[in-house]
Amino acid sequence: MDADKSEGCCSVQLIDGDGIYNVSRIDHFIKDVKLADCGLSYAVVSIMGPQSSGKSTLLNHLFGTNFMEMDAFKGRSQTTKGIWLARCAGIEPCTLVMDLEGTDGRERGEDDTAFEKQSALFALAISDIVLINMWCHDIGREQAANKPLLKTVFQVMMRLFSPRKTTMLFVIRDKTRTPLENLEPVLREDIQKIWDSVPKPEAHKETPLSDFFNVEVVALSSYEEKEEQFKEQIASLRQRFMHSIAPGGLAGDRRGVIPASGFAFSADQIWRVIKENKDLDLPAHKVMVATVRCEEIANEKFAHFITNEDWRKLDEEVQAGPVSNFGKRLTTILGSCLSEYDGEATFFDEGVRSSKRQQLEEKLLQLVNPAFQDVLGHIRWGILEKFKASFDKALGIGEGFSSASQDWFKACMTQFDEECAGAIIEQANWDTSKVRDKLVRDIEAHISSVRTSKLSELTSLYESKVHEALSEPVEALLDGANDETWSTVKKLHRRETESAVSGLSSALAGFDMEEETRDRMVKSLQDYARGVIETKAKEEAVRVLMRMKERFGTIFSHDSDSMPRVWTGKEDLRAITKSARSASLKLLSVMAVIRLGDEPDNIEKTLTVALLDPTKNDTSKKSITTSDPLASSTWDEVPSSRTLITPVQCKSIWRQFKTETEYTVTQAISAQEANRRGNNWLPPPWAILALIVLGFNEFMTLLRNPLYLGVMFVAFLLAKALWTQLDIPGEFRNGALPGLISISAKFVPTVMNLIKNLAAQGEDPPAANPENRRSSNNTSSSENPPDHKSSSKED
């Protein structure tokens, strides 16, 4: 049969006649009557009795249910099959009524009592009140119809590990004239006899009936004969079921109640155990039901939490960036979820409820922990960025590095702790120390990075200052090498190094660094300054040959007033050459080693003796040693670290220097000789004597013919004019061959120019006075200067 609903009542077949528990229908029934909302405020009433004894009729009148009743006109037969469940109408608290299949029915036969025992045990296990429906005329009879039923009830009660204390309400039907006060003692005596006759376990052999049951007796008139009186008695009995679980009520001292939300599952599990013919451990069953139901409630709340809009929105905000009041908001959401669990699981076993609550809380915390970690990550990142910006700004306005780093570190860590406190939720004692430690490491790493960068900048700054202060001055000093060069370099080095070290030390004072580190940086700057000089000295040493040639050329080709020399032949070329070479050798000796210390050396003397005065060197070799003082790769008492040019290299450089400057000296000698030749136009004496001897006849011929003298005079004048016009001495200063070529090119134009001038003068009137003639000659001369350039143009 299907579930039946009528106004104010709802019934369902809980277990069918074949003993099959109807899970789906009972679940729908529980939802329809909203049993889960009742908590512990509900009662279960069941009725037992012989078949066709009016059980369903009694329940329908007493509780307003709609169980199927037997139609007396159709004969007596089985009406209720299995176990039916209904909710009473108009009774508080919520009361569930179970109508059990009647006992001693012919449909099952005498031998099939298994279902009777199973249903009886089931009713005792889940009912708070058990109605025993019996006929009045059976009281006091040895073979009464209710005796097998009572034996069955007492026997199955022994199968409960820890039996509940159940109220057993005997309803005496069709009461006769015998007063209830007389019937009740007889009934109780019969009940006690049955109890005593039932075999019991050792633990309960002496246990009185009152430890298991509260026995109540009520009598009702015949429904068929005295219907009105029956209904009045039913109404009175109904009042006893109002607030039945309150202290003093019919079920006021019940124990081990299963919360209403677990009723369906509990009944299912109890029936399974009973069907398997196992002893029913109700306390263990209660724990089991609590475990399953609390687990279901916890899972349900966890699933609801996952889909909770507030949580989803909060999680999305966390993914997007920092969230304010995260801890407070999440605490509220978690608290609401756990409160809902507590509300639904409050009536289950406390140990199980607490355990499952803890598991739910752990699952929830495990779910929200990534969001919490993200929040901490946002906080850490934000604080780190704030520290970087604030720290850099503080350094930018000139605040000391150490004080700025310490002040902002403290401020940022305080802010981090405050923001972490705002992110903590009440339900968890999460540790933020790891994130805090990471933030500390990140800040310290940034401080270290900035410190390294700033120290590097300071080092680079002062190194650049040192390089700028030393590089060019040292180069200039080494270029003009003299006896005071290295002394001046040392003073410059000392002055600039001390200035840079002082500035660096002042700058480092704000870094709060160890003395050892500071000294190391100062030492590094000092070494750098020395390195600048050494590097520049090495660069100049590489160019020493070029510098020597430049110095030689400067001194050799210029006089004391720095004017270019004109080799007239009067200069002491040997002395000039020696002076220039001495100056070049001075440069070589200065560049041979680095002299930043106070250690003396004999390099200049050695070079002078070995290279400039070979005679003295030969004497020295004969008297002192037979070895060459420059035949070595090191200088005496000079370490190799200070050596720029070794003795062997000096000798090689000097040899190359002399070779490359030899041409300059040779050119000077040639210039002197050419100058001497240019200033002496008389032939040698032997040539004059030869001319006199050989030209005597020609001379005498001229004396005898005066006309030859006139011709010779004119030829002399013409030759002198050509001499002047052609500038023959000037042309031959450049050499004989170039002079001849130049003169030959200008000869014909010059002759033609002279002829034109003479012709022009012959055409002028002779009346001009001498002054006018001179003026005319001057004008003509100015118009046609005897310059070869004019002649060239004319040509």
From Swiss-Prot:
<feature type="binding site">
    <location>
        <begin position="49"/>
        <end position="56"/>
    </location>
    <ligand>
        <name>GTP</name>
    </ligand>
</feature>
<keyword id="KW-0175">Coiled coil</keyword>
<dbReference type="InterPro" id="IPR030386">
    <property type="entry name" value="G_GB1_RHD3_dom"/>
</dbReference>
<feature type="coiled-coil region">
    <location>
        <begin position="218"/>
        <end position="244"/>
    </location>
</feature>
<feature type="topological domain" description="Cytoplasmic">
    <location>
        <begin position="1"/>
        <end position="682"/>
    </location>
</feature>
<dbReference type="InterPro" id="IPR027417">
    <property type="entry name" value="P-loop_NTPase"/>
</dbReference>
<dbReference type="Pfam" id="PF05879">
    <property type="entry name" value="RHD3_GTPase"/>
</dbReference>
<comment type="similarity">
    <text>Belongs to the TRAFAC class dynamin-like GTPase superfamily. GB1/RHD3 GTPase family. RHD3 subfamily.</text>
</comment>
<protein>
    <recommendedName>
        <fullName>Protein ROOT HAIR DEFECTIVE 3 homolog 1</fullName>
        <ecNumber>3.6.5.-</ecNumber>
    </recommendedName>
</protein>
<feature type="compositionally biased region" description="Low complexity">
    <location>
        <begin position="775"/>
        <end position="784"/>
    </location>
</feature>
<feature type="topological domain" description="Lumenal">
    <location>
        <begin position="704"/>
        <end position="706"/>
    </location>
</feature>
<dbReference type="GO" id="GO:0003924">
    <property type="term" value="F:GTPase activity"/>
</dbReference>
<dbReference type="InterPro" id="IPR046758">
    <property type="entry name" value="Sey1/RHD3-like_3HB"/>
</dbReference>
<feature type="transmembrane region" description="Helical">
    <location>
        <begin position="707"/>
        <end position="727"/>
    </location>
</feature>
<dbReference type="GO" id="GO:0005525">
    <property type="term" value="F:GTP binding"/>
</dbReference>
<dbReference type="GO" id="GO:0005789">
    <property type="term" value="C:endoplasmic reticulum membrane"/>
</dbReference>
<feature type="transmembrane region" description="Helical">
    <location>
        <begin position="683"/>
        <end position="703"/>
    </location>
</feature>
<dbReference type="Pfam" id="PF20428">
    <property type="entry name" value="Sey1_3HB"/>
</dbReference>
<dbReference type="InterPro" id="IPR008803">
    <property type="entry name" value="RHD3/Sey1"/>
</dbReference>
<feature type="domain" description="GB1/RHD3-type G">
    <location>
        <begin position="39"/>
        <end position="254"/>
    </location>
</feature>
<keyword id="KW-0472">Membrane</keyword>
<keyword id="KW-0547">Nucleotide-binding</keyword>
<keyword id="KW-0378">Hydrolase</keyword>
<keyword id="KW-0342">GTP-binding</keyword>
<keyword id="KW-1133">Transmembrane helix</keyword>
<feature type="region of interest" description="Disordered">
    <location>
        <begin position="761"/>
        <end position="795"/>
    </location>
</feature>
<keyword id="KW-0812">Transmembrane</keyword>
<keyword id="KW-0256">Endoplasmic reticulum</keyword>
<feature type="topological domain" description="Cytoplasmic">
    <location>
        <begin position="728"/>
        <end position="795"/>
    </location>
</feature>
<feature type="compositionally biased region" description="Basic and acidic residues">
    <location>
        <begin position="785"/>
        <end position="795"/>
    </location>
</feature>
<comment type="function">
    <text>Probable GTP-binding protein that may be involved in cell development.</text>
</comment>
